[in-house]
Amino acid sequence: MSKLIQLDRRSFLKSASLTAVGGSLASVTNIGSAAEMGQGGIKNGKFNFDEIYDRDGTGNVKWDSQYARFGAENIDVGMGIADMDFRGSPAIKEALEKRIKHNNWGYELLQESYIESIVQWNSERHGLTVDPATIKISSGVHTPLIAALNAVCKPGTKVLLNTPTYNGFYGDLHWSRTEINDSEMYKDDDGVYHIDWDDFEARMTPDTYAFILCNPQNPTGNMWSEEDLMKMGELCLKKGVVVLADEIHCDFVMKGQKYVPFASLPDKAIVDNSVTMKAISKTFSLASMKSAYYFSTNSALLDRVNYMHRADINSLGIVANEAAYRHGVDWFDQLLPYIDENHNFAEAYIKEKLPLVKYKKAQGTYLAWLDVSAVGEAIDAEKNASDKGMKSDTHYLEQWFVDNAKIQLNPGVGYGTGGNGHMRMNLGTPRPLIKKAIDNLADALSNV
């Protein structure tokens, strides 16, 4: 095994610097010392997202659960689950510290100021006006989505999804006792996904009651245009299919792209046929704070969902989320271009170092959807998966990447029809770690 791969993550965290990438690629900044960084990971008055912030031992899923699965010595870079590895916004920490000083944790009322902060964020960042009276708070996007599915679908009926799509939706279908109805998208020659409109409409059979829209699309990174969303909405309205819009990644819009909220569409009837679910948990990496919300312009539809929904508030989650909405904008405004450059760097560096891997820069999210079908062919992933009793070629690829490159990526098969031959890589991490992951993989594939 190469010296590169033998350098484990803990040694890497202690390293003083990494070599900058030459040529036209984005540079990888040296890892600053604590003294250089200053308090809270701030360097020269700016948030330093190149800082390698050690999350080990906090019980986090992205790193610690992978150590439990594969052994800590076998993971240099965890790039699976969709949360970020950066220090959070100082505003969130300050608000939590202030609340914790009050040492009582009884039942709490939801404050109007929190709803107001949600309305303000949507208005100022996305030009979307949301009636505060229609906003309902939940513990995460899954909870209202399951409630909505139970509200509009009979057990055993179908739910339409454009695939590849977020793997968590399939669990939501299980808990709502509904059936999968995948409409596979297609890739053009540039690697961009598009909806197969003929198939999309054909799958709107009388027993299909709902369509789960992922906007932007996880894992492919599509930022859906108004034209696309209108066509989806028109077909759903025509066929009696309710649109359930998961827009949790909506703040991560890459340069030159645009996020169009489904609720902003110009046709009232189309918008009234929908429920939107959102959270700021991706934006500020607050997944464990368990706070989200949903809304609809259709009061009757909203009442049906509310009837099926139950979620109490998390007091610290509300504090953290409101602090993010009101005081975290500077942090996020610095983070967003950093994520955009991570995508640029990954696309260029993969092209340079990994001829067997294809990646087209995502239009949104901090996720990279990698075409690793050529790698699968080179290592005979399908046969090896079958011989070892694994679920799919991409499950074998996940294990192979850990064994040979010490990186963990999510298997593509979990993202529905069309996921085979792909892996999802999380780019919400310091650029030096992205470089290390690609270098490790390049070294491993040099022997194939």
Model-identified regions with their sequence ranges:
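N-terminal small-domain helix-loop-helix segment of the aminotransferase-like
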Residues: 41-140, 147, 326-327, 447-448
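Active-site phosphate-binding strand-loop segment of PLP-dependent enzymes
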Residues: 187-257
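PLP-dependent aminotransferase-like
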Residues: 45, 150-213
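Conserved glycine-rich beta-strand-loop-beta hairpin in the small C-terminal domain of fold type I
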Residues: 339-347, 359-375, 381-384, 419
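Helix C-cap/helix->beta junction micro-motif
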Residues: 176, 238-239, 405
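PLP-dependent aminotransferase class I/II
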Residues: 273-352, 357-364
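N-terminal secretory signal peptides and thylakoid transit peptides that target proteins
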Residues: 1-21
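PLP-dependent enzyme catalytic core of the Aspartate aminotransferase-like
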Residues: 383, 390-396, 400-448
